[in-house]
Amino acid sequence: MARNELRPVIKLRSTAGTGYTYVTRKNRRNDPDRLVLRKYDPAAGRHVDFREER
């Protein structure tokens, strides 16, 4: 597999509905499902779940 196929760049969009996003990379071999991380949303002013958007 090429480098870009194994660790693609993904967007993490806030579930609070603010439209705030984080950009990161993930390893598809270790995390084949959609990623969900709890991170700080400055627009909401609190920690919320961020879901992977491809």
UniProtKB/Swiss-Prot annotation:
Keyword hit for Cytoplasm: no
Ribosomal protein keyword on record: yes
Record keywords, A-Z: Ribonucleoprotein, Ribosomal protein
SUPFAM superfamilies: Zn-binding ribosomal proteins
InterPro entries: Ribosomal_bL33 (IPR001705), Ribosomal_bL33_CS (IPR018264), Ribosomal_bL33_sf (IPR038584), Ribosomal_zn-bd (IPR011332)
GO biological process, one term: translation
Molecular-function GO term, any one: structural constituent of ribosome
A Gene Ontology cellular-component term: cytosolic large ribosomal subunit
PANTHER family membership: 54S RIBOSOMAL PROTEIN L39, MITOCHONDRIAL, LARGE RIBOSOMAL SUBUNIT PROTEIN BL33M
Similarity field: Belongs to the bacterial ribosomal protein bL33 family.
HAMAP family assigned to the protein according to its UniProt record, in alphabetical order: Ribosomal_bL33 (MF_00294)
Protein's name according to its UniProt entry: Large ribosomal subunit protein bL33A
Organism per entry: Streptomyces coelicolor (strain ATCC BAA-471 / A3(2) / M145)
Annotated gene: rpmG1
